């Protein structure tokens, strides 16, 4: 049976444990892939996809709880592990890892490294799940990304980061208090 056919709650906890045990050199890449998997699964469960079954307490001890809140907490934890490997991700070109990581719909020059993809994903996550943290964490992430691209030969990635900053600040202004 392939992983696509298996229920995620059956293989995802084991995969997450294997990612945590992987060599340090590939931790950032695998953690980013794990975040993409969790995000994809949570979207499926939230928007009418197949929801995990309830298990007895004994069987559930090895599985993460699949409530929206717990999935968000798990994603937050995975994204923190991704961020801890930011230096490694800055050296990983998106083209080299496109099998594992979805680069999005923009040209690669806008998000040329896995660090750029990770920051984009984190901003999307924080804006969707933790509105009161969007400005604080988002500005820090965007500042890091902009500093990383200030000396690039082209301005595409820097412009993408600046546009993200404007979009996020505009969205933050319109969050009801």
Where in this protein do the model-derived segments appear?
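Extracytoplasmic/secretory-pathway proteins
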Residues: 1-177
